[in-house]
């Protein structure tokens, strides 16, 4: 795996994690694990026998302005991997410097990835840029979600100031299938209907039956949720005041 070079002479934590999964002896195995800085992983475990479950560990003190984190993962052919995190990613207040999180996930032929991290919480005054890219083969399978919490609504705290730029991309066989951007600045939450919870769930390769079933389940969220199916990509988007409803 080619590692991404970290920028030098910057304030904040610079961290990188390179992962590769290969099928060995009848199961998916983490064969490459290279890290720089505070990004690391727990020991893989196998509650589903052949499927490799892995927990990513972000810096324990949270993410602040000037931090730059890069995660690269390759899931080789015929592998099945579930990647999650033990807790939410917290982006704290910054005096102006941006915190950056770049995530690059590549799925080879017939590979399956369940990308199920906990939510990302953005404290008032945080300045964060997130960029997540999935590179798929047409024969691979992806289940992923992207959960954002603006402020801390459980204690009545809103994202009254700060900035968030979130970019989500899915490419299939080198062609773009989804490129989505969210930009929030200066406490202006009109673009998300002033809801603190913003969620996106993705499934490839989806079908019409799944789309109809999901739309029925989204009915209680009324106008704050929707599902689409485009070229096999099933996308669910939702806004909420309650994280339990999102989950």
Swiss-Prot record:
UniProtKB keywords: Chaperone, Cytoplasm, Nickel insertion
Record flagged with keyword Chaperone: yes
Annotated GO MF terms: nickel cation binding
Subcellular location: Cytoplasm
Cellular component annotations (GO), alphabetically ordered: cytoplasm
Keyword Mitochondrion: no
Domain of life per record: Bacteria
Function: Required for maturation of urease via the functional incorporation of the urease nickel metallocenter.
Protein name: Putative urease accessory protein UreD homolog
Organism per entry: Escherichia coli O157:H7
